Amino acid sequence: GRTVVNHLNQVFVDAVRATGGNNQYRFLMVCPYAANSTEPALAALEIPDDDRLIVSVHAYIPYGFALQNPGSDKWLASKPGCTSDIDTLAEVLDRLFISKGQAVIIGECGAMNRDNEEYRAQWAEYYFAKFKAIGIPCFWWDNGAFLSGETFGLFDRQLSQVRYPVLLEGMMKGASGETAAGSSAA
């Protein structure tokens, strides 16, 4: 598992760099086994020998709100049980990578639609602000699903419109760092 992924990460970096051209200057992303965001998986990640790498993790947390089906439709920043997974991941990523000068992104995140746009917006504002405070950009997983399955859809490609503008506003507030959540999330 993890040993194989660590080996493949180095093979990937070596292969891209060996092709020449601008590939010697490109930033490349590597991830732990399954892009897992747990501390054991992150601690087991061996960073390939290269100075232009970004660690990418996927983090749908807290699981009960973000991904579990069925799961909770409510999320409140005032409840430590709602924020603890986010706070812990930020601390772990900062300690293992950011504090050592290693770039990190949250390559996938999101909270499924449960007819709870306001709660999702509050979650997104807190989540994005928390990681913005330590220099980690977050990328919403917009899978285009609105009606069934893992409903992370945000932008309706058929109608060319944002389906959840309040959610998008929460993400943008958090990502800008110009929010009350940004100051309390740090």
Annotate the PLM regions.
Residues 1-81, 91-112, 133-136:
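Active-site region of glycoside hydrolase catalytic domains
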Residues 1-5, 78-86, 116, 120, ...:
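Residue-level preference for long, well-ordered alpha-helices that form the structural scaffold
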Residues 65-68, 85-92, 140-146, 175-177:
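Low-complexity, flexible helical/coil segments
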Residues 86-94, 123-128:
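Short, acidic/polar
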Residues 116-186:
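Aromatic-rich peripheral "rim/lid" segments of glycoside hydrolase catalytic domains that contact
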